[in-house]
Amino acid sequence: YESYLDFPSINLSQSGDTSEAMVKRFEKDVLPFSPEYLLILGGTNSLRAGVPAADVISDLKEIQRKCREHGITPILMTLPPINPENIQKAFNEPTYEGWKASFDEVNAFIRGEVHIDTAAPFEEMEELPTWLALDGIHGDWNMKRMMAEVINLEFPKVIAGD
């Protein structure tokens, strides 16, 4: 989605990353850039593999803590839905049956923090439609554009403290 943002950004994500791996990569991958803000979208791979929502929330809290410790403002982003059938086809990997409840739990936590609700455009969707993410997890250009529209609208409000 970063190519559709109205402000400069650096994409530090890694495909397949778990929330635990994001915590471990923080010092090496985030700190060298000395960002003022960190947009954090993580937990999808963990939750679809059956990692408990409480563990993902703990990882997100740890990333927030590390950000604040280094003078970075953490901004969490809610998790859009996935499409387990398409994930199975693309990666030959099963998805944890309770993924929806886990996503709901993590998103409820995120919505109580400084956040941008990037899942909002997809809330009425039970699963992510193929036309938005062929592989069921990584948004295609149209999904990325939809997420960027939300970020572009909400980011100025978040940094202004609204």
Region locations from a protein language model:
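Serine-esterase "nucleophile elbow" of acetyl-processing enzymes
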Residues: 1-15, 20-37
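Cell-envelope and extracellular/periplasmic
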Residues: 11-17, 39-47, 68, 79
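Surface-exposed cleft-lining segments at the edges of enzyme active sites
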Residues: 11-14, 44-54, 91-97
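Extracellular glycan-modifying ectodomains
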Residues: 25-34, 44-47, 53-57, 66-68, ...
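Charged helix-capping and loop-helix junction motifs
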Residues: 53-62, 99, 103
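A short helix->loop->beta-strand "cap" motif at the edges of active sites that frequently abuts
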Residues: 69-74
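Catalytic His-Asp segment of secreted/periplasmic serine-dependent ester chemistry enzymes
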Residues: 81-162
